[in-house]
Design a protein with these regions (language model features):
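Conserved NAD+-utilizing ADP-ribose enzyme module
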Residues: 2-300
Length: 300
Protein backbone atom coordinates (compact mmCIF):
# COMPACT_ATOMS: atom_id res chain seq x y z
CA UNK A 1 0.00 0.00 0.00
CA UNK A 2 2.05 2.90 -1.25
CA UNK A 3 -0.32 5.50 0.16
CA UNK A 4 0.15 4.22 3.70
CA UNK A 5 3.01 6.69 4.01
CA UNK A 6 0.35 9.37 4.38
CA UNK A 7 -0.87 7.75 7.59
CA UNK A 8 1.70 9.93 9.30
CA UNK A 9 -0.89 12.69 9.11
CA UNK A 10 -2.91 10.89 11.75
CA UNK A 11 -0.23 8.84 13.46
CA UNK A 12 2.20 11.72 14.04
CA UNK A 13 0.12 14.28 15.89
CA UNK A 14 2.29 16.88 17.62
CA UNK A 15 -0.50 18.76 19.36
CA UNK A 16 -4.20 19.16 18.83
CA UNK A 17 -6.86 21.73 19.58
CA UNK A 18 -10.49 20.65 19.86
CA UNK A 19 -12.68 23.25 18.19
CA UNK A 20 -16.37 24.06 17.86
CA UNK A 21 -18.92 21.72 16.23
CA UNK A 22 -17.92 21.21 12.62
CA UNK A 23 -21.16 20.21 10.91
CA UNK A 24 -24.26 22.32 11.12
CA UNK A 25 -26.67 19.48 10.41
CA UNK A 26 -25.05 16.08 10.65
CA UNK A 27 -26.66 13.84 8.06
CA UNK A 28 -28.05 16.51 5.72
CA UNK A 29 -28.56 14.89 2.31
CA UNK A 30 -27.37 16.35 -0.98
CA UNK A 31 -24.32 14.97 -2.81
CA UNK A 32 -20.61 14.19 -2.40
CA UNK A 33 -18.67 12.31 -5.12
CA UNK A 34 -17.99 8.66 -4.43
CA UNK A 35 -14.42 9.16 -5.62
CA UNK A 36 -13.79 11.73 -2.89
CA UNK A 37 -15.22 9.46 -0.21
CA UNK A 38 -13.03 6.57 -1.35
CA UNK A 39 -10.00 8.86 -1.35
CA UNK A 40 -10.66 9.74 2.30
CA UNK A 41 -10.84 6.03 3.14
CA UNK A 42 -7.81 5.11 1.06
CA UNK A 43 -5.32 5.71 3.89
CA UNK A 44 -7.23 3.69 6.49
CA UNK A 45 -5.66 0.24 6.91
CA UNK A 46 -7.76 -2.86 7.40
CA UNK A 47 -6.69 -6.48 7.13
CA UNK A 48 -7.35 -9.48 4.92
CA UNK A 49 -6.19 -13.08 4.86
CA UNK A 50 -4.42 -13.85 1.60
CA UNK A 51 -2.82 -16.91 0.05
CA UNK A 52 0.82 -17.32 -0.95
CA UNK A 53 0.12 -15.37 -4.17
CA UNK A 54 -1.33 -12.41 -2.32
CA UNK A 55 -4.90 -13.21 -3.40
CA UNK A 56 -7.64 -12.71 -0.77
CA UNK A 57 -9.23 -15.84 0.64
CA UNK A 58 -12.96 -15.59 0.04
CA UNK A 59 -16.06 -17.64 0.66
CA UNK A 60 -19.27 -18.09 -1.28
CA UNK A 61 -22.93 -17.65 -0.41
CA UNK A 62 -26.07 -17.95 -2.56
CA UNK A 63 -26.64 -14.93 -4.76
CA UNK A 64 -29.50 -12.91 -3.17
CA UNK A 65 -30.99 -12.24 -6.62
CA UNK A 66 -30.52 -15.73 -8.04
CA UNK A 67 -30.21 -18.69 -5.67
CA UNK A 68 -28.72 -20.78 -8.48
CA UNK A 69 -25.70 -18.49 -8.58
CA UNK A 70 -23.01 -17.70 -6.04
CA UNK A 71 -21.73 -14.48 -4.53
CA UNK A 72 -18.05 -14.26 -3.70
CA UNK A 73 -17.53 -12.52 -0.35
CA UNK A 74 -14.37 -10.69 0.68
CA UNK A 75 -13.66 -10.53 4.41
CA UNK A 76 -11.97 -7.49 5.95
CA UNK A 77 -10.92 -7.21 9.59
CA UNK A 78 -10.71 -3.89 11.43
CA UNK A 79 -8.28 -5.44 13.95
CA UNK A 80 -5.16 -7.29 12.89
CA UNK A 81 -5.51 -9.40 16.05
CA UNK A 82 -8.90 -10.65 14.87
CA UNK A 83 -7.34 -11.44 11.51
CA UNK A 84 -4.64 -13.42 13.28
CA UNK A 85 -7.29 -15.36 15.19
CA UNK A 86 -9.12 -16.18 11.96
CA UNK A 87 -5.88 -17.25 10.31
CA UNK A 88 -5.12 -19.60 13.19
CA UNK A 89 -8.59 -21.12 12.81
CA UNK A 90 -7.98 -21.69 9.10
CA UNK A 91 -4.63 -23.33 9.86
CA UNK A 92 -6.44 -25.75 12.16
CA UNK A 93 -9.48 -26.44 9.95
CA UNK A 94 -7.80 -26.28 6.54
CA UNK A 95 -4.04 -26.70 7.04
CA UNK A 96 -3.44 -27.04 3.30
CA UNK A 97 -4.73 -23.46 2.90
CA UNK A 98 -3.73 -21.98 6.24
CA UNK A 99 -0.18 -23.23 5.94
CA UNK A 100 0.57 -20.78 3.13
CA UNK A 101 -1.89 -18.02 4.10
CA UNK A 102 -0.88 -14.73 5.70
CA UNK A 103 -2.34 -11.46 6.91
CA UNK A 104 -2.10 -8.55 4.50
CA UNK A 105 -2.91 -4.88 4.99
CA UNK A 106 -5.48 -3.41 2.63
CA UNK A 107 -7.26 -0.09 2.18
CA UNK A 108 -10.70 0.45 3.67
CA UNK A 109 -11.59 2.19 0.42
CA UNK A 110 -11.35 -1.18 -1.33
CA UNK A 111 -13.82 -2.76 1.07
CA UNK A 112 -16.28 0.11 0.71
CA UNK A 113 -15.93 0.08 -3.08
CA UNK A 114 -16.83 -3.61 -3.21
CA UNK A 115 -19.78 -2.96 -0.89
CA UNK A 116 -21.06 -0.17 -3.13
CA UNK A 117 -20.62 -2.27 -6.26
CA UNK A 118 -22.43 -5.23 -4.68
CA UNK A 119 -25.61 -3.15 -4.48
CA UNK A 120 -25.71 -3.03 -8.27
CA UNK A 121 -24.21 -6.43 -9.00
CA UNK A 122 -24.18 -8.97 -6.13
CA UNK A 123 -21.58 -11.16 -7.82
CA UNK A 124 -19.22 -9.97 -5.10
CA UNK A 125 -19.87 -8.92 -1.53
CA UNK A 126 -17.99 -7.74 1.51
CA UNK A 127 -17.96 -8.71 5.17
CA UNK A 128 -16.30 -6.12 7.44
CA UNK A 129 -15.65 -7.61 10.87
CA UNK A 130 -15.36 -5.10 13.72
CA UNK A 131 -13.50 -5.51 16.97
CA UNK A 132 -15.84 -7.25 19.41
CA UNK A 133 -14.84 -5.10 22.43
CA UNK A 134 -15.44 -1.93 20.41
CA UNK A 135 -18.84 -3.16 19.24
CA UNK A 136 -19.76 -3.90 22.85
CA UNK A 137 -18.64 -0.39 23.84
CA UNK A 138 -20.78 1.03 21.04
CA UNK A 139 -23.83 -0.94 22.17
CA UNK A 140 -23.40 0.39 25.71
CA UNK A 141 -23.25 3.97 24.44
CA UNK A 142 -26.33 3.47 22.28
CA UNK A 143 -28.20 1.98 25.22
CA UNK A 144 -27.28 4.98 27.36
CA UNK A 145 -28.54 7.36 24.69
CA UNK A 146 -31.78 5.41 24.28
CA UNK A 147 -31.05 4.48 20.67
CA UNK A 148 -30.92 0.80 21.63
CA UNK A 149 -33.00 -1.16 24.12
CA UNK A 150 -32.81 -4.73 25.37
CA UNK A 151 -35.98 -6.79 25.49
CA UNK A 152 -36.24 -10.49 26.23
CA UNK A 153 -32.51 -10.85 25.78
CA UNK A 154 -32.58 -9.20 22.35
CA UNK A 155 -31.03 -5.87 21.39
CA UNK A 156 -33.46 -3.68 19.47
CA UNK A 157 -33.47 -0.18 18.07
CA UNK A 158 -35.74 2.37 19.72
CA UNK A 159 -38.18 1.68 16.87
CA UNK A 160 -38.31 -1.97 17.95
CA UNK A 161 -36.31 -3.36 15.02
CA UNK A 162 -33.45 -5.86 15.50
CA UNK A 163 -30.06 -4.22 15.89
CA UNK A 164 -27.99 -5.37 12.92
CA UNK A 165 -24.62 -4.37 14.32
CA UNK A 166 -21.91 -2.74 12.27
CA UNK A 167 -18.43 -1.33 12.52
CA UNK A 168 -18.52 1.38 15.20
CA UNK A 169 -16.74 4.72 14.94
CA UNK A 170 -16.46 6.95 17.99
CA UNK A 171 -16.37 10.74 17.86
CA UNK A 172 -16.52 13.72 20.18
CA UNK A 173 -19.79 15.59 19.82
CA UNK A 174 -21.54 18.68 21.11
CA UNK A 175 -23.75 17.47 23.95
CA UNK A 176 -26.71 19.59 22.87
CA UNK A 177 -26.73 19.09 19.10
CA UNK A 178 -24.84 15.83 18.66
CA UNK A 179 -22.72 17.44 15.94
CA UNK A 180 -19.10 16.21 15.67
CA UNK A 181 -16.30 18.39 17.04
CA UNK A 182 -13.40 19.28 14.74
CA UNK A 183 -9.71 19.20 15.62
CA UNK A 184 -6.99 21.55 14.53
CA UNK A 185 -3.68 19.79 14.87
CA UNK A 186 -0.02 20.23 14.19
CA UNK A 187 0.96 17.14 12.23
CA UNK A 188 4.35 15.91 11.17
CA UNK A 189 4.68 14.34 7.73
CA UNK A 190 7.88 13.66 5.80
CA UNK A 191 9.86 15.50 8.44
CA UNK A 192 7.80 18.69 8.18
CA UNK A 193 5.15 20.12 10.49
CA UNK A 194 1.97 21.78 9.31
CA UNK A 195 -1.49 22.66 10.61
CA UNK A 196 -4.46 20.54 9.56
CA UNK A 197 -8.12 20.75 10.50
CA UNK A 198 -10.08 17.51 10.46
CA UNK A 199 -12.99 15.70 12.08
CA UNK A 200 -11.69 12.48 13.62
CA UNK A 201 -13.72 9.29 13.96
CA UNK A 202 -11.96 6.60 15.99
CA UNK A 203 -12.19 2.83 15.72
CA UNK A 204 -11.11 2.58 19.38
CA UNK A 205 -13.20 4.33 22.05
CA UNK A 206 -10.40 4.38 24.63
CA UNK A 207 -8.03 5.98 22.14
CA UNK A 208 -10.49 8.85 21.72
CA UNK A 209 -11.07 9.02 25.48
CA UNK A 210 -7.34 9.46 26.09
CA UNK A 211 -7.23 12.29 23.55
CA UNK A 212 -10.19 14.01 25.21
CA UNK A 213 -8.76 13.59 28.72
CA UNK A 214 -5.49 15.14 27.60
CA UNK A 215 -7.29 18.06 25.98
CA UNK A 216 -9.46 18.54 29.08
CA UNK A 217 -6.37 18.82 31.28
CA UNK A 218 -4.68 21.35 29.02
CA UNK A 219 -7.67 23.47 27.94
CA UNK A 220 -10.82 22.39 29.80
CA UNK A 221 -12.97 25.02 28.08
CA UNK A 222 -12.33 23.41 24.69
CA UNK A 223 -14.14 20.18 25.54
CA UNK A 224 -16.85 21.65 27.74
CA UNK A 225 -20.36 20.36 27.05
CA UNK A 226 -19.11 17.52 24.87
CA UNK A 227 -19.44 13.76 24.99
CA UNK A 228 -18.39 10.65 23.10
CA UNK A 229 -20.92 9.31 20.62
CA UNK A 230 -20.89 6.53 18.08
CA UNK A 231 -21.94 6.02 14.48
CA UNK A 232 -21.69 2.89 12.36
CA UNK A 233 -19.33 2.89 9.41
CA UNK A 234 -22.03 2.24 6.82
CA UNK A 235 -24.11 5.14 8.14
CA UNK A 236 -21.12 7.48 8.09
CA UNK A 237 -20.24 6.49 4.52
CA UNK A 238 -23.87 6.99 3.50
CA UNK A 239 -23.79 10.46 5.03
CA UNK A 240 -20.54 11.31 3.25
CA UNK A 241 -22.08 10.18 -0.03
CA UNK A 242 -25.20 12.26 0.52
CA UNK A 243 -23.86 15.63 1.64
CA UNK A 244 -22.04 18.43 -0.14
CA UNK A 245 -21.17 20.21 3.09
CA UNK A 246 -17.47 21.05 2.57
CA UNK A 247 -16.56 20.04 6.11
CA UNK A 248 -17.48 16.45 5.22
CA UNK A 249 -14.22 16.40 3.29
CA UNK A 250 -12.43 16.96 6.60
CA UNK A 251 -13.61 13.64 8.01
CA UNK A 252 -10.74 11.31 8.90
CA UNK A 253 -11.00 7.77 10.22
CA UNK A 254 -8.34 7.10 12.85
CA UNK A 255 -7.05 3.56 13.14
CA UNK A 256 -5.24 2.33 16.24
CA UNK A 257 -1.47 2.88 16.48
CA UNK A 258 -1.01 -0.90 16.45
CA UNK A 259 -2.93 -1.29 13.20
CA UNK A 260 -1.08 1.59 11.57
CA UNK A 261 2.29 0.21 12.63
CA UNK A 262 1.43 -3.25 11.33
CA UNK A 263 0.35 -1.81 7.99
CA UNK A 264 3.42 0.39 7.68
CA UNK A 265 5.71 -2.57 8.37
CA UNK A 266 4.06 -4.41 5.49
CA UNK A 267 4.06 -1.52 3.05
CA UNK A 268 7.77 -1.83 2.34
CA UNK A 269 7.70 -5.31 0.85
CA UNK A 270 4.18 -6.67 0.62
CA UNK A 271 2.95 -6.99 -2.94
CA UNK A 272 -0.46 -8.33 -1.97
CA UNK A 273 -3.25 -7.43 -4.32
CA UNK A 274 -5.07 -4.23 -3.37
CA UNK A 275 -8.71 -4.95 -2.51
CA UNK A 276 -10.07 -2.31 -4.87
CA UNK A 277 -8.26 -4.14 -7.66
CA UNK A 278 -9.51 -7.54 -6.57
CA UNK A 279 -13.05 -7.71 -7.86
CA UNK A 280 -12.58 -11.08 -9.55
CA UNK A 281 -9.57 -12.86 -7.98
CA UNK A 282 -8.94 -16.52 -8.55
CA UNK A 283 -8.89 -17.42 -4.87
CA UNK A 284 -9.88 -20.56 -2.99
CA UNK A 285 -13.12 -20.77 -1.06
CA UNK A 286 -12.52 -20.04 2.61
CA UNK A 287 -14.12 -22.22 5.29
CA UNK A 288 -17.10 -20.35 6.71
CA UNK A 289 -15.66 -20.09 10.21
CA UNK A 290 -16.40 -16.38 10.39
CA UNK A 291 -20.14 -16.73 10.04
CA UNK A 292 -19.98 -14.39 7.11
CA UNK A 293 -22.65 -16.03 5.03
CA UNK A 294 -25.44 -13.70 6.07
CA UNK A 295 -25.13 -10.95 3.51
CA UNK A 296 -23.08 -9.46 0.75
CA UNK A 297 -22.82 -5.95 2.12
CA UNK A 298 -22.50 -6.47 5.82
CA UNK A 299 -20.85 -4.24 8.42
CA UNK A 300 -20.97 -6.36 11.49
Amino acid sequence: MKRLAHLGVLAGLVSSLWLAPAIGRYGTATALPEEQVLQILNNVPVFMITNDKGEPLTFEIPNPQDQNKKTQVFTFFISQKDAEGALNAIKTQRPEIGGVARISAAALSGAVKIALESRKNPVVGVDIIPSKPQLEAAVNLLKQSGDLVERDGKILTKEGKPFRGGTPLFFLADSKTGNPIAVEAQVRENGQTRTQRFIPFYFDKMQLQREVDQARQQRPELVKDTGIRVVMLDNLVATMLSTNDPVAGQIQLVQTPEAIQFALQQSGGNNAQRPNQANQPASPQRPNQQGGGQGTNRNR
